[in-house]
UniProtKB/Swiss-Prot annotation:
One of its GO terms (cellular component) is egg chorion. This is Chorion class B protein PC10. It comes from Antheraea polyphemus. The lineage of its organism: Eukaryota, Metazoa, Ecdysozoa, Arthropoda, Hexapoda. Signal peptide: none annotated. Residues 94-130 are annotated as: Right arm (Gly-rich tandem repeats). Residues 23-93 are annotated as: Central domain. Belongs to the chorion protein family. InterPro entries: Chorion.
Length: 130
């Protein structure tokens, strides 16, 4: 089901985005309108792993995975990767507000208000009051 998806860890197939071919495994085409081709981002590891290994995290934009080296004659090597829901873009860039007050109890621009950090506009203490 949706809660025990492809990764077998109880969170693999959450959301319909996991079904998009460009978002989960397979080849990812790269198109550029620039005169200079994209160079990309590289993440390298020179560690030896034995047994099952699961790595999770976030990388900016699209990602690919590759394996180089010698595999033993017994066993297998597989890379499964996911890279979001296929909808790429920067949705917002915001600066940090100026917090003015004694030990964080003051009014900050665009941030929380007053004692215990009750917030405005979706920013708050997480206590469920606002």
């Amino acid at each position: 089901g949706a809660w025990n998806g492809r990764l077998g860890c109880g969170c693999g197939g959450i959301a319909p985005a996991a079904e998009l071919a460009a978002s989960y495994g397979g080849g990812l085409g790269v198109a550029s309108a620039s005169a200079i081709p994209p160079v990309g981002l590289g993440v390298a590891s020179e560690n030896a792993y034995e047994g099952c290994v699961e790595v999770a995290g976030n990388l900016p934009f699209l990602g690919t995975a590759g394996v180089e080296g010698v595999f033993p004659t017994a066993g297998a090597g597989v890379i499964n990767y996911g890279c979001g829901n296929g909808a790429l873009g920067i949705t917002a860039e915001r600066g940090y507000g100026a917090g003015i007050g004694y030990e964080g109890l003051g009014l900050g621009y665009g941030a929380g208000i007053g004692y215990k950090g009750y917030g405005l506009g979706g920013c708050g203490c997480g206590c469920g009051r606002l």
